[in-house]
Amino acid sequence: THLAQPEAALVNNVAAAHLEGFGSIEGVARAKGEIYRGLTPNGVAIINSEHNYIEFWQKEIGSHSIQYFNAGDYKAENVKHSSNGSTFTLVSPKGSIEINLPYLGEHNVKNALAATALAMNVGASLADVKAGLEHRSQVKGRLFPIQVNENLLLLDDTYNANVDSLQAAIDVLKGYDAFRILLVGDMKELGEDSLKCHQQVGEHAKQAKLDLVLSYGIESAVISEAVLGKHFTDKAELTAYALDIIKQKLQENQKVVVLAKGSRSMKMEETIYSLKDSLC
């Protein structure tokens, strides 16, 4: 905002990421809130009602008007999820419209609300928003679906990972009526909170009652341990183990969904590519 003053500014979420640099989630919130400092005189500060750190941001926001998404000004009603994405009624200050979103998961509905709030505050109509949300191709590394065959779906969510995004991805995997496998790598840059954060994800995976959890790296061992899964320090060994399980389930005519996710440095996409090449 030193280079160009925005007419609308938004903090989409505040999560346990980059804690090594910012020290705490409050530090992350303070740093993200600096974006509001450069608003134009009539600019609008947009806040996620589920990640509301207004006490840290009030100084930066000053007298600017505030709008909220997820609850308040922009929200989703009648939400229905499927293997192809989500449908919902988008409610805004300028009316409502039905949306068919081609992205998986509840978290992407919330991302759509964030995008809507920004777009409408700089002049977009509801029709513009609908066109923008519905006519976007899925992005590799972001819950990208790879349908290998009728009974096998790979979900490539390997671009990066933090606690919130990994839990959101687990929630997507949980919703499938299939044998559900999670391949999870370490989450990096969590500093002193690393163990706690990985344990939190392990508990979330346990609550999701996934069928198999395989972890790779160092810190992620506690995730697989929480669900009586299996940990690996060699990615090729993890992939080979997963491949054997998948082949067994397919021979039993079971549907299988595999989700891979981890921090960027873990390169968990290599597991997806290997499985795809071996099973196509």
Residue ranges of model-derived segments:
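Residue-level marker for buried hydrophobic side chains located in beta-strands
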Residues: 45, 154, 182-183, 258
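Glycine/threonine-rich flexible loop motifs
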Residues: 19-26, 166, 191-195, 269-270
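ATP-dependent carboxylate/acyl-activation modules
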Residues: 140-142, 265, 269-273, 280
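Active-site beta-alpha connecting loops in nucleotide-dependent enzymes
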Residues: 139, 162-228, 235, 263, ...
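Short SAM/SAH-binding signature in class I
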Residues: 8, 114, 250-262
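Acidic, Mg2+-coordinating active-site environments of NTP-dependent enzymes
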Residues: 2-153, 178, 203-206, 211-212, ...
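Short amphipathic alpha-helix with an adjacent loop that forms part of the alpha/beta core around
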Residues: 2, 239-252
